[in-house]
Amino acid sequence: APVSLAEIKVMVGLTIFIMLGALAIFALLLRLRQWPNREMAFNVWINLPTFDPTAGGDVVKRLKRDARINIILGFALLFVVPIIAIFAARHMGMSILGSHHTMVWGIALWMFLPLSLFMRGLAMGRIADMITNRRARLVAAVAADAPRTAY
């Protein structure tokens, strides 16, 4: 039996609730656990395997730009993915609403892709803040060690 509109509303509502809950928990853990912790070593290659810090330009500016882009893309995917899915299904002659199984997986993917981009954007922003704070501490330490001139 095809999926009814009421079932779609329930599935989408539950999925959005789970996505927002996961995003809130992730943001809280970033703050409460202070990830990445400045006492621990942070390996860019492990934590951000697709980010190349040697590609040129200021790392903080690029991280903040990439964080914003990921968050914007995550928000845009919430609206673009259903359109693409419907277009692709019609193009291939499939019915998205024909199977509960297809609908569940489609809605799960629809929410997982934006959620992963939101989380990536938050993490990159947090890393940019960590680097900014570290630079400020280093500049303050150098300024404190600078020779003082008597006037």
Where are these regions (language model features)?
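Long, highly hydrophobic alpha-helical transmembrane signal-anchor segments
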Residues: 1-24, 90-107
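Alpha-helical transmembrane segments of integral membrane proteins, especially early/N-terminal helices
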Residues: 1-2, 30-40, 78, 141
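Juxtamembrane inter-helical linkers in multi-pass membrane proteins
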Residues: 35-59, 133-148
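Membrane interfacial helix-start motif at the N-side
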Residues: 54-71
